[in-house]
Amino acid sequence: MKRVLVLVFVLMMLSGAALAGVYESDFSGGTDGWYARGTGEAAIEVNELGLYTYGRQATWNSPGRQFPLIPGEEYKISVEVMQEEKDSAEFILSVERTKLGIASYQNLVFADAKKGEWVTMSTTYLAGSYDTFVLYVEGAANASFTMRNFAVEGLFAGEEVVEVDEEQLVLKNDKERKQMFDRMELQKTMKLTGQNNPLFTQRFGADPGVLVWNDRLYVYTTNDVIEYDAEGNVKENTYAKINKINVISSSDLVNWTDHGAIPVAGANGIADWANNSWAPCAAHKVIDGKDKFFLYFCNGGNGVSVLVADDPAGPFTDPLGHALITRATPNCADVLWLFDPAVFVDQDGTGYLCFGGGVPEGMTANPGTIRLVQLGDDMISIVGEPQVIDAPYVFEDSGMNRIGDTYYYSYCSNWNTGGNELGITNGAIEYMTGKSPMGPFEYAGELFVNQGRFFGLYGNNHHSIVEFKGQHYLVYHNRPVEKAMGISGNYRSPQMDKITVNEDGSLAPVRGTMTGIDQLSAFNPYEKVSATTMYREAGVSVEGYADKAVLKGGNGSWIQIKGADFANGAKTFTMKASSKSGGAVRVALDRTFGDVLCEITIPAGSEGVEFTVDTKNVKDIHDLYIIFGGNVEAEWWQIH
């Protein structure tokens, strides 16, 4: 055991180096950095046989340890396992990989362990293009088990991982490429077939704000980032690490283009004086004959700020260099939470901004912490003093809309609503109505109960109401991606469902669903399509933002386009792509292993090359699956 500790010490001291070596542990000296994965009673301890895992509630409640593996390097991994509870049990040696905070999983090798007998699992593993790697032993239902002699042989990274050349993918001919794809183990998606919610899964996204522009709906979300404790366990979201805002858009509300994560705050942010970027909302206005787009956000709970762009996806600039709303703003000093902006531009071009939240002690029924102010013509200044909206049982999360001649102010209720005469429930979306954008407003009803009532995962409620192509929708957040990942820490994802506006102007209660919105129109594959457009995905990531956003696909990753209309048939497929180490692309119809439309080989060293290949002819409406081998960076694709 002493030899192992020395190796780990050397690796951490040689910052920036890559060192060959062998990690070995028989656990005679302790747990050696291993921890029990999962929540509940699962635990580990060292006994005379090795590392003992017990109290498991599920197969993935297992011993895990993070290893500084280097992308592109191959490792030999082995471990011995024994269980004494079942006649026979299947164990799995697996790896959890994260990229930009999003985890994915891969089973490496399986083995059946008879009761009371040691079994060895051994395999090789080529580390993909990921940020972190956790190796773990799972399976055997909830049986307790012991493992020993865990070994990893290969190159290890220091504290600062250096870039290394990945092993090149060389495909000599079409046959080799076909064999690679036919035998490929595809990565798993976190969005089931038939589910249009959540809107995306490649990152988290909370607190949705909306904007309609050029026949597209844009959704802006808080970019939740997974946080870990000192032992590598996922911990509750503190929101402290959030400094980016996601933006996606769609014309059919099923296939969404990911425009990337806008670097808003932090040292490298557009507003580098801000620490955080929460709860975005957006607006459009023509100023001096030019289209301008305004993105409002809060820097934690102490102010509202604004960015400006010439396109709804950016790039954005910081016009003020400081917050728009602060505690020095009149009538704002006593607002507990100076956050959660909601912007509204009326038909006459006048802009308004709502913000605020929190419940002062003893003021549950009438917190008085919401403010409403008119914006200046430039949308980056205010006119007059912010006024109070007396929203009953308010907690946070403002919204402002106009339907006909009625103005709707909506918000999230607090968590102490019991016994009120209005029928307000905890953590729900309520709404008020008025005949002026500055109020007064009267309470009108409850639109959406807490999402936990539908999905079993309770938490803060945050919403936007939007009219798109003649139908009103509720955009909100839920926690399906973290559930699919097997974690629980209030990491959220955006969803949509329809709103029914009754003849009298009241809003019918909305029911949250995973089915979501039906596709509004067939997808057009003949236009140049951003490669970051997808209905579902598995294992891909999006880097850059605005016109610099690109899709990165690793081995076995894929995206799905839903409902593409091939009314004009197909002759060729073109993709603009790059690959440092070589890659390949397969396009299949209707399922991951469906009829192959075409395949492309992308040689190592390709940079921004347009590849065109012949396709099978196809008619009618089909789903498209774009599957990646090796490593590919894709910009756009098009059918001719």
Where are these regions (language model features)?
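Secreted extracellular polysaccharide-interacting domains
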Residues: 52-71, 90-92, 98-109, 554-570, ...
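Sec-dependent N-terminal signal peptides
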Residues: 4-14
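Extracellular glycan-recognition surfaces and repeat-rich motifs
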Residues: 21-54, 523-546
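Beta-strand acidic-aromatic groove motif in beta-rich domains, primarily in extracellular
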Residues: 62-63, 86-97, 133-135, 582-589
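Extracellular beta-strand ligand-recognition surfaces/modules
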Residues: 27, 91, 122-154, 615-637
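Sec-dependent signal peptide cleavage junction
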Residues: 15-21
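Extra-cytoplasmic beta-strand recognition segments
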Residues: 25-27, 61-89, 119-127, 149-150, ...
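Carbohydrate-active catalytic/glycan-binding domains of CAZyme proteins
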Residues: 165-599, 606-640
